[in-house]
Structure formats: structure tokens, C-alpha cells
Amino acid sequence: MILSPIEQSIKRKIEAVGKPLKDWDIQIYRGVLTGCNEAFIIDAAKRAEILSNCQSEDERKRTEAIIRPILRGRDIRRYDYVDSGKYLINTHNGVKEKGIPPIDITDYPAIKGHLDSFGDAVMLRSDQGDTPYNLRNCAYLEEFEKPKIMYPNMTKYMPFYFDIQGFYQNDKSFLITGRHLSYLAAFLNSSLFKFCFTNSFPELQGGTRELRKIFFDKIPVLPVDDNTDELFEELLRSIQDFYSNEKALEIDRHIFDLYQLTPEEVALIGAVNL
């Protein structure tokens, strides 16, 4: 692709001050792979049914604790998400290195009954843990509970959502944990990122982009200090509480200022359709 002189100027500015994301203090992970989504990802009605089948209050509390709200890649929006009312039955396989034991299905009879109803689809699936009732090993299990940036693995719109609610995610999405996530989420949702880096991700059929980690690692992003991240934390909280174009433009202006873009450069970037 041949860039105009002003486009080349913007690209040089980004690359001159940017640090590749692979060198940031962040981690990028894939969402949960169950091997049988129809059994392990349930709606609110099925969740209520499973809980009603518990034989004691203790079982109900244990069961409720491992049925976690989950977002799919398609549910993620720019600064927002669609609540599809889905839940993950998180019968995880533990993390031996951290002393987290696997879920013992005998402690969860109501969940066992639900999973048993799927027969070989659960029992014989390839992605399983120590038992067919357990999900496959996931060394980053605790990362889902942390503040994180969520985004789909394939998308036309490249949306990012900063989650502090502890959503789990399916395997059609990725999560980023680490430092300065408020700023990073704002940058990834900005006009500048879309303008400069959309073409850094392979285009698939229908204009969809593939947002794999191997491509993210190469993206240069200006590092910031804690004070700057706190500024974007406030901006992010505001726009995620109630979205408006004015708030999105305000975030863009702060990003443009950080990169010291000229009015001419800003005008060109402002034409990007978000």
C-alpha cells in the first residue's frame, strides 16, 4: 500500500515513540475452550434449573459459585458489551503450579446430572481435563477475574471493552491483562489505532479482520505513566457508563495530544468510520 506524505508522517510519529506490545507488561490469552459449548455454556433458564436441582443450600452455593457469566466474541462492542445472558459451567481442571485443585464433580450433583444428559458429546470430547466433567487445563484461569481488555478474535469493527466485572470469555475472543490497561483500551478504541493499524491484521472474507496475538505483538504503542493511565481510567469509566460520540471524540483528542499530531493529521484521521 502506497501512503501519502501525511500518512507517512503519522506512521513515523507512531513508530518513533511506540513500544511493541510484546514488550509491554501485559499478557494476551484466549478465552475458554470447552469442547462442547452446548453443555458448558448455558442460558439463565438452564442456570436456574440446575440451581433448583441442588439438594442442599451448601450444594446450591457451591454450584452457583462456579456458574460464571460469560461473553462471546460477538457480544463485545466498542466500550461496551451485549449481555446475552450466557453462563459458563466452570468445572475447571485446577492449576497445579498455584495449588488450585480441579473441580470434583461429586461435589456438584446437579451439574453432573446436566452434563450427563449430553452423553458422548461430553464424555468423548477431545478437549477435557482429568475427567470428562472437567474443562481442559488453563494455566491462566485466574486472569479472567482480573481487570482486562476483551476483544473478539475476528471482527469487522475491531471493538475493545475494558472489563472489571470478572466476565469469562469463550474461545472466539481474547483478553489482555497487565499494566496501564485503561490507556491501552482507549488507544485500541481510538481513531488513531483504526487509521494506522487496521491493515496490520489480515483481512478475511467479507471484510472481517483476524485479531491474533502474533499481529498484536508488533503494534507500537506509546508507553505512559501511572498518572496518564489514571486520566484514561476516568474517561473510560465515563464512556462505559454511558456512551456518547462526544466522549469518544474527547478520548481521541487526548490520544492525538499524546502523539503530538498536527491539525492537518487529526483532520485526516478524523475521517475514519468507527
Label each residue range with its predicted role.
Residues 17, 21, 25, 110-114, ...:
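Non-catalytic DNA-recognition/assembly elements of restriction-modification systems
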Residues 1-227:
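Polybasic, glycine- and aromatic-enriched phosphate-binding surface used to engage nucleic acids
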